[in-house]
Amino acid sequence: MTEKSSNDPINKTATLRLAQTDMCKGYANGSIGIIVSGLIWLISATISYQYSAKQAVWTLLIGGMFIHPMGMLLSKVIGLSGTHTKGNPLGNLAMEGTIFMIMCLPLAFGLSLQHAEWFFQGMLLIIGGRYLTFASIYGLKLYWILGAVLGVAAYLLFYFKVQSFGSLLTGSAIEISFGLLMFFSFRRDNLNG
């Protein structure tokens, strides 16, 4: 009988890849959450257009609390688990990223007290930075591109003094586009694999 001793090397690459595969299968590469987030940005854009930027700030903040539960629900509707295996260490990384993002919200809200549109541009930077960690969580380098696109968009929107409605539409379009790309990539890979 051969048992592994604590001195035997662990194949960390294989272990990480298994954890990433588990995350990908549970959340369709994270695509469902991105699409839900993009739809919340679109709803906020509508609120900004119909009512005010201040109400759109609250719509995005409150709506953002429902991204994960709505993503889980939609994942289950399309036949996915909508969750990851208990004990998957990447679940902890996802939670830590969420907590960091929540800790950044007061900064974005403070920006809105100066200029309402700065809130949305700040949020694009915050979520763009958060998506960078998703490259490790899901093992998909496309998240680096998503994070960079959101970050560059935030800077350009700020530089060109784009108002709230335009910033919200930009965030929505970027997230929905990337979310759909990731979803169809997930479907292709899982229908063929």
Give the residues covered by each predicted segment.
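Short, Lys/Arg-rich, polar N-terminal cytosolic tail immediately upstream
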Residues: 1-25
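N-terminal membrane topogenic signal
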Residues: 21-35
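Selected alpha-helical membrane-embedding segments in polytopic membrane proteins
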Residues: 37-92
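Helix-coil boundary and interhelical linker segments in multi-pass alpha-helical membrane proteins
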Residues: 45-58, 108-118, 158-165
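C-terminal ends of transmembrane helices
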Residues: 72-86, 129-136, 179-188
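Helix-adjacent hinge/juxtasegments
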Residues: 79-114
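Membrane-proximal helix-loop-helix units in multi-pass membrane proteins
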Residues: 104-151
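Terminal transmembrane helical module of multi-pass membrane proteins
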Residues: 143-193
